[in-house]
A protein has these predicted regions:
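Active-site phosphate-binding strand-loop segment of PLP-dependent enzymes
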Residues: 103-190, 195-202, 358
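Hydrophobic/aromatic ligand-binding patch that stacks against planar heteroaromatic rings
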Residues: 86-88, 141, 170, 242
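Conserved PLP-anchoring active-site segment centered on the Schiff-base-forming lysine
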Residues: 62-116, 122-124
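Phosphate-binding glycine-rich loop
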Residues: 26-73, 86-91, 97-98, 164
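Helix C-cap/helix->beta junction micro-motif
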Residues: 91, 144-145, 319
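PLP-dependent aminotransferase class I/II
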Residues: 33-38, 43-49, 110, 122-126, ...
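N-terminal "arm"/small-domain region of PLP-dependent enzymes with the aminotransferase-like
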Residues: 1-26, 229-231, 360
């Protein structure tokens, strides 16, 4: 069976983990944590980065920094992972779900402004498959209404937004705050792991305090205070040096990893462009808007209906290939229906929930396997 995902190891992970253990500093915020954070800040232009134990934790930190309180409204796309909404629900937010575009799963920026009320505190955008949302439009709306923008960039490492003036900005560097994932399904990994990026300077000091269990420990270690104490809310968000050491091995090979994934993505796109199935209607290829780049986090197809998708997945499974669907629309989840009185009609989110299917894409997927997958799909 060709798996959907296989975590890639560069060969340096165990060496760096051993180095971290031998250093005598493995509890977190040591050498490897600093190396990783400095790399991301320099490479992608983030003002401040803090590694976390997961992207969920990074989103929860963002919710605290945005000062989300009971009754505040937060606009979130419905077609996303539960953490995107849950991080804000935990702070008491009333989630207002937004629909996707009809031709790609990202939040429909043209629908956002109609969802804003006097209670709206934040807009959370998700760069699905590592492909940018329309950030110029979203930031313009947010700035007009004085609303914080948080980028859920879990899938978007090393992907960019291109403004109309040609300016190229890394995803995660545009909103006030952003969150990344290094889960084993992502392009670069640490098993579990994430990162909060702070692009608005007013949040940096408090972010460090929240990251360090509500203490000003970071300031103490920089010699800015003579002792540290409990000064704010927070939790134990920082990862151990073992996780950071693993991540550093991945970072060192990021360009090679990205180049290989993009090569696979491009071959899928080329090979399936002329696909004319007989047993199902022709699925749609992924859309990368002109303002976005592609980091090859995911290759998906959009079937015409749920029955076609079921037939597609079963056909590949019968041939030894694991393909998978993705999110169920959060506005239809049992938890949301229980806690919220809002009733939303989000047809595009529902369509992607019913029709989107993802193909295997990982570093060690061979050329022969890619061709086999393409040819197997063409048998439909």
């Amino acid at each position: 069976m060709i798996p959907f995902n296989k975590p890639y190891l560069t060969g340096k992970e165990m060496q760096y983990i051993e180095d971290a253990v031998k250093s005598g500093k493995i509890s977190g915020n040591g050498l490897f944590t600093k190396k990783c954070q400095e790399f991301f800040e320099k490479e992608f232009g983030f003002k401040k980065t803090l590694l976390t134990t997961s992207c969920t934790d990074a989103l929860e930190m963002a919710a605290i920094l945005a000062d989300i309180k009971e009754g505040d409204e937060v606009i979130v796309p419905s077609f996303t992972f539960v953490s995107t909404a849950l991080a804000f629900v935990r702070q008491g937010a009333d989630i207002v779900f937004a629909d996707s575009y009809s031709d790609n799963p990202n939040i429909d920026a043209d629908q956002i402004e109609a969802l804003i009320t006097e209670k709206t505190k934040a807009i959370v955008v998700v760069h699905y498959a590592g492909v940018a949302c329309d950030m110029d439009k979203i930031m313009s709306i947010a700035n007009k209404h004085g609303i914080i923008v948080i980028e859920d960039a879990a899938q978007a490492i090393d992907s960019y937004y291109i403004s109309k003036d040609g300016t190229k900005k890394a995803l995660g560097s545009i909103g006030h705050l952003s969150a990344f994932s290094f889960h084993e399904t992502k392009n670069i990994i640490s098993g579990e792991g994430g990162m909060l990026c702070i692009n608005d300077g007013r949040f940096i000091q408090r972010a460090e305090i929240i990251w360090e269990k509500g203490t000003n420990r970071s300031q103490f270690f920089r010699g800015e205070v003579d002792k540290y104490s409990w000064v704010d809310t927070g939790s134990s968000f920082l990862p151990s040096e073992i996780i950071s050491a693993f991540l550093w091995a991945q970072i060192e090979n990021m360009r090679d990893i990205q180049d290989k994934r993009i090569k696979i993505w491009n071959r899928y796109y080329e090979g399936l462009s002329s696909f004319e199935p007989v047993s199902i209607k022709k699925p749609k290829l992924p859309l990368v808007p002109e303002y976005a780049t592609n980091n090859a986090h995911m290759f998906y197809l959009v079937c015409d209906n749920v029955d076609d998708r079921t037939k597609f997945i079963q056909h590949l499974k019968d041939k030894g290939i694991l393909s998978v669907f993705h999110y169920l629309s959060l506005h239809k989840s049992s938890y949301y229906e229980k806690y919220s009185t809002r009733k939303s009609e989000l047809p595009n989110s529902d369509m992607f929930s019913d029709c989107l299917v993802r193909l295997p894409l990982f570093y060690e997927l061979t050329n022969e396997q890619v061709e086999y997958i393409i040819n197997t799909i063409k048998e439909l």
